[in-house]
């Protein structure tokens, strides 16, 4: 079972928490869900170069709080905060609610599964050899503290006539162990031969306390190791 399902979804409520954190009545749920999808799509399209790891959306009473985890926060904030203000106004128009934006820096993008997948996809689009891109990502992750990593690439790799799957694994990636802190990310590479898919699993150790926020708290503590979490709030 653990081999097939999304490892983040399998661990929700155990050591992972949701990226959308709000409660809604039945008649409001659909509208708010579509707003979340629009916000995430807009941010990912508008900030392609900002290395977005994830977008967390919270909705206190008649407000919307959006937290963007990025490896390049400077690209989001812009000169004197001009870009982040423009982004805040756009999200306010989408939600018709008072919007607060927080930017959290990802201090170790080499062990963030989503950012690894995006990096490999970009290299495939630039015609870098897929084996070289995968090996480089595996070596960087293991060097920076990951306990295990697995990378899958699928599609017409290297322009081959027949699509296939290539994968590399180093260290342990215990997908069945629910206490394992496993990060998972996907990306698509739009190449001249067609679309290639990239999946990445990163094992960061075991979380022994039963706490849905434990994984996020560990990420924040890791960010603090490099001189404090970089964070900007825009009301």
UniProtKB/Swiss-Prot annotation:
Q: Does the keyword Ribonucleoprotein apply?
A: yes
Q: Name one GO biological process term.
A: translation
Q: Which UniProt keywords apply?
A: Ribonucleoprotein, Ribosomal protein, RNA-binding, rRNA-binding
Matching PROSITE patterns: KH_TYPE_2, RIBOSOMAL_S3
Domain KH type-2 residues, every copy: 39-107
One Gene Ontology cellular component annotation? cytosolic small ribosomal subunit
Q: What does this protein do?
A: Binds the lower part of the 30S subunit head. Binds mRNA in the 70S ribosome, positioning it for translation.
**What do we know about how this protein assembles, alone or with others?**
Part of the 30S ribosomal subunit. Forms a tight complex with proteins S10 and S14.
What's the protein called, per UniProt?
Small ribosomal subunit protein uS3
**Species name:** Chelativorans sp. (strain BNC1)
